């Protein structure tokens, strides 16, 4: 399993390598950041982009550390990804969800794959389109089962479309993304999958907008619709306002103010998000 020291070591290795291990040629910021589920995107929404800066015939790798702290809970994520030919993305992530007010923790492992179907982010008439899969499995099914979840693992599938519009607002470039996801996950999987009365997939929408203030600095907004399947507590949609700084092609930092709504009966869960990613 991915531990904090493992991800930290990977990021340090990436920064010290100075890109010596991988030749990459994509434009800075076009690989996005790493989401809390490990795939390329913003913070809570996967985009159609492929992580890192590998173009055709190239490869790249990333490692990330993420922390989200809201009123009664905190989430820690470590992960890594591999991109090949600007078409395939493979990712892994380990989530640890601390129940700060209740005591204890939940966790899950996520393995993801993404494939570019068509289009380009920058220089094509149609947006970049990707198909993604995320297999998730909780560490301990005791609490999810107690609150009514049906399964301890599940598979999310999504289609994402991303496009960068040049000189869109006050001469600045604007990235728009739309994602449609089929999922059974409760609280992105931390509370299991489905419920004892309905184990069917739910269709949800996720969207992002990012305005590039400079070539390597962006502000944006994300919205993630959530299924509401467990009777013991309402599950609200998520949203955030973020600032992303792509220091160079090997280091990026994303911070955000997040509104996660009601989680496990605790209302108005709001707080801060920070993520650091190193890329080869």
Where are these regions (language model features)?
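Detector for outer-membrane/organellar transmembrane beta-barrel domains
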Residues: 149-229, 237-238
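Cleavable N-terminal export/targeting peptides
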Residues: 1-33
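C-terminal appended segment following the main domain
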Residues: 240-280
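Transmembrane beta-barrel domains of Gram-negative outer membranes and organellar outer membranes
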Residues: 23-168, 213-217, 227-229, 234, ...
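General helical structural elements
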Residues: 7-9, 118, 167, 185
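Short, flexible coil/linker elements and helix-boundary hinge sites characteristic
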Residues: 17-19, 80, 171-172
């Amino acid at each position: 399993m991915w531990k904090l020291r493992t991800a930290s070591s990977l990021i340090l290795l990436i920064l010290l390598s100075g890109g010596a291990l991988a030749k990459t040629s994509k434009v800075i910021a076009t690989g996005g950041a790493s989401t809390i589920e490990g795939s390329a995107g913003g913070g809570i929404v996967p985009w159609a982009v492929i992580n890192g800066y590998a173009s055709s015939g190239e490869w790249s790798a990333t490692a990330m550390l993420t922390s989200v702290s809201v009123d009664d809970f905190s989430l820690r994520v470590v992960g890594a990804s591999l991109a090949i030919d600007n078409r395939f993305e493979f990712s892994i992530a380990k989530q640890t969800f601390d129940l700060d007010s209740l005591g204890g923790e939940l966790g899950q492992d996520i393995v993801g794959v993404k494939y570019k179907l068509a289009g380009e982010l920058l220089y094509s008439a149609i947006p970049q389109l990707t198909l993604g899969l995320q297999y998730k499995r909780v560490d301990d099914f005791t609490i999810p089962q107690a609150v009514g979840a049906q399964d301890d693992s599940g598979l999310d599938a999504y289609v994402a479309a991303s496009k960068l519009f040049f000189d869109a607002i006050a001469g600045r470039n604007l990235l728009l993304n739309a994602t449609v996801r089929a999922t059974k996950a409760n609280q992105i999987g931390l509370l299991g999958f489905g419920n004892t009365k309905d184990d069917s997939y739910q269709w949800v929408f996720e969207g992002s907008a990012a305005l590039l203030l400079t070539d390597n600095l962006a502000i944006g907004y994300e919205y993630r619709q959530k299924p509401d399947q467990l009777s013991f507590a309402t599950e609200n949609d998520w949203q955030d306002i973020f600032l992303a700084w792509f220091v160079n092609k090997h280091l990026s930092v994303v911070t955000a103010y997040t509104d996660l709504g009601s989680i496990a009966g605790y209302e108005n869960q709001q707080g801060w998000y920070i993520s650091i990613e190193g890329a080869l």
